[in-house]
Amino acid sequence: MLNNSRLCIIWLFGLISGFNLMITGNTLNYWLAKEDIALQTIGILSFITLPYSINFLLAPIFDAVQIKYLNKIFGHRLSWICLTSSALIFLIYIFSFLDPSTNLLLFAFTALIISFFSAAQDTILSALRTEIVPKESLGFTSGIYIFGYRVGMLLAGSGAIYLSIYLTFNEIYKIFAGLVFIYLILLIVGIKYCDLNENIHIQIIKNDIKNNQNKKNIINFIYNALKPIGSVYFIILILIFLVLYRLPDNLINVMINPFLLHLEYDAFEIASVGKFCGVVGAIIGGLVGGVIMKHKNILNSIFLFGIIHALGHILFIFLEINGKNSLLLFITIGIASITGGMTMTAYIAFISALCQGKFRATQYSFLSSMMGISRSIFPIISGYMVVNFGWQNFFLFTTIITIPSLLILLKIKTKLQ
């Protein structure tokens, strides 16, 4: 049974991950849309979050390599957290002086580097979370983690857009740099207070990597790390499912800011209804999903939540047909966010449940990287889809594309039984 202090730490992990993601994700996307950057370009720039797709390549390093001096002071995981946080603080502050309308290439490159360190930190936090949470508590703690994740998104998303009424985005990103510093202090204090004993576990992993001659390169290491999960065919099925299940949301997320600006909503309406209510709904959905999964197994939950969430996407079509309508926007965002929070909770719990053995960090990072591929690579075409087929067909596609992922899930369920 987890005590309250550890639950708070798990919540803080989620908050930091959600906050960091928004810095180079939706908030950056809104900044670009406000600068009237072309839809096709905005879609292409979703690649900025690409490091989240390949962070599993870094997981073996975080598992095995110690930062000599910091490790003595903070311990293995926390020393890596300190290093990545320091890099983020510096880079975000530098980024706050750039302008996408005058030098888009430098702007995008710097954002990509920030995304790299954000993804690296996300990998470390996820590994630490899987180490301190018993398997039987994964469903409930996933809800706590997603709660924190959504609060982080709220701060860096809705909060930033609301502040853009009064401040420039350059000023807002300076504030972001300061908040990342505060989060680092909270993490150091929280982890030290909880006295998380990770060093024995890490030393076992380090020795195993060093002594096992089959793990001479990264590919062999990942292959051996994934063996406890199942056969190659089974893992491929899981990877395809993980990409497709999150694809509808990720396509919409890249285009939601241009869509709301297209309907002529202002910054306050987008921040309050489009973002704040959306994040609150996602938090509620995450908590509801966590509670449901305490009484219903993860596979059945993720299937049910996926169907409900897909139907919610149809409301965006009605919003496009009706035009600017605050009540309909509230209903659409509310339903999409609550059901989205439920699916995300089940999704994280599903990945966590698959991880087993000594190399959970590598397993979790590799599997969760599929969420990154779904978020970074495929949405590149979203702008072209809207320009060539229109908003209504775009949202119809996001509803239909859910079906293949659910069919694959049924196949996975059969394999597990």
Swiss-Prot record:
Pfam families attached to this UniProt entry: MFS_1
Q: InterPro entries given for it?
A: AmpG_permease/AT-1, MFS, MFS_dom, MFS_trans_sf
> Which keywords fit this entry according to its UniProt record?
Cell inner membrane, Cell membrane, Membrane, Transmembrane, Transmembrane helix, Transport
**Location(s), subcellular:** Cell inner membrane
Top-level taxon of origin: Bacteria
* Covalent S-S links between cysteines: none
Single GO molecular function: transmembrane transporter activity
Q: GO CC annotations?
A: plasma membrane
Q: How does the protein associate with the membrane?
A: Multi-pass membrane protein
User: Matching Gene3D superfamilies, A to Z?
Assistant: MFS general substrate transporter like domains
Under the heading SUPFAM superfamilies, the entry gives: MFS general substrate transporter
List where the protein spans the membrane. 7-27, 42-62, 78-98, 104-124, 143-163, 171-191, 225-245, 273-293, 301-321, 328-348, 366-386, 389-409
Q: Which NCBIfam families match?
A: 2A0125
Which family would the database say this protein is a member of? Belongs to the major facilitator superfamily.
Question: What name is this protein filed under?
Answer: Putative transporter AmpG 1
Source organism of this protein record: Rickettsia conorii (strain ATCC VR-613 / Malish 7)
